[in-house]
A protein has these predicted regions:
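Nucleotide-sugar donor phosphate/pyrophosphate-binding loop at the beta->alpha transition
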Residues: 76-78, 85-109, 153
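Aromatic "clamp/platform" in nucleotide-sugar-dependent glycosyltransferases that forms part
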Residues: 250
């Protein structure tokens, strides 16, 4: 396999407008496999010499050009995108008609599809793709790494909590992501304010991430803890002390922070507009509430805080079945479908 990056993934630091801060990832992104940057190679020649072209989405001119080249060269295309109707509906009127024509053009240039989950699979089916062309390749993280790293922090979790000013008996509600309107972090605060804790200790609220809503959130919840942007190596320790992760987003294609939290044995609450809900959430490990419904979120918080320990254990068991091994199975099935069992160049 040879990977061509449209942009240099190893740039030291870049400004992320969603986080509203500079981001520098601490996980190596190009180690251990054959890769090149687009600026250093010829895309036509790369595709011409490939047995199959695997694309991640079609959102840039480079990706769309790659589709055209593959069609011209007769190279089969495997498409793996995030699209789902929950997050990316076609819309109505002329705009919707134009979008459908555009999407149909993209899909007609693809030989098979690698679905990240059930909602993504439905997206393709609703647009006329045959089920025989769709292969499940779950949107996954390195579960083993997150589980191991989380477990390694177990002995110092009490000290970590106290260092944040959180008492040992306090439960922790966690949000991880960009502090932007689409993620709706503010409704967590509104839901907590509706709950009568009946003399019980109120959970601590921790926000990990940054963005345009930070000032507003600080005003709404001055007692909340804002940790700012945290890197991959830092997240397992935070998930480890959290009891419930909440992702209340509007139009969220998936939500990989849910995978991460589940691997670290955390109970989950998501809105019904979060794509992963269909595949990962059940009453055993979490709750799904109607997007924007503050009262429903409040009820979910009460339930999950009460049952967080049991739900966290089920979360970890559930996510172990949604990993890289399943991705490999799906990819092999797709390659067999293309009759390319002896693929050397992808």
């Amino acid at each position: 396999m040879r990977v061509i990056f449209e942009n240099n993934p190893e740039n030291l630091a870049y400004y992320d407008p969603g986080f509203d801060c500079k981001v520098e990832w601490d996980t190596p992104l190009t180690d251990g496999y054959n890769n090149e940057y687009l600026s250093n190679t010829n895309l036509d020649n790369e595709i011409k010499n490939a047995d199959v072209l695997w694309l991640h989405g079609w959102g840039s001119s480079v990706l769309r050009n790659a589709l055209r080249i593959a069609k011209r060269q007769g190279v089969p295309v495997l498409m793996r995108g995030e699209n789902c109707d929950i997050a990316m509906p076609d819309g109505y009127g002329l705009r919707g008609w134009l979008k459908r024509r555009y999407i149909n053009w993209v899909l007609n240039h693809c030989s098979a599809f690698l679905a990240i989950g059930s909602e993504n699979q439905k997206y393709y089916l609703h647009r006329g793709v045959g089920i025989h062309k769709i292969f499940m390749t779950p949107y996954a993280i390195d579960n083993k790494k997150f589980i191991s790293n989380s477990n390694s922090f177990e002995l110092i979790s009490g000290d970590f909590k106290s260092g944040l000013g959180i008492s040992s008996e306090q439960k922790i509600i966690l949000f991880v992501g960009k502090l932007i309107p689409r993620k709706r972090p503010d409704i967590i605060i509104k839901a907590l304010n509706k709950i009568d804790w009946k003399g019980n200790t109120k959970p601590a609220l921790v926000f990990v991430g940054d963005g345009e809503m930070r000032e507003e959130l600080v005003k709404l919840a001055p007692a909340a803890i804002f940790l700012g942007f945290k890197n991959q190596s830092e997240l397992p320790a935070i998930y480890n002390i959290a009891d419930v992760l909440i992702l209340p987003s509007h139009r969220e294609p998936w939500g990989l922070v849910v995978n991460e939290a589940m691997a670290c044995a955390t109970a989950i609450i998501v809105s019904d507009e979060v794509g992963c809900a269909t595949d990962l959430l059940n009453d055993g490990c979490g709750k799904v509430f109607p997007s924007g419904d503050v009262s429903a979120l409040a009820n979910s918080i009460v339930y999950c805080i009460k049952n967080s320990e049991t739900m966290g254990k089920i979360s970890q068991i559930t996510i172990k079945k949604w990993g890289f091994s399943e991705d490999i199975i799906g990819l092999k099935k797709a390659i067999n479908y293309l009759d390319l069992q002896d693929v050397d160049n992808t």
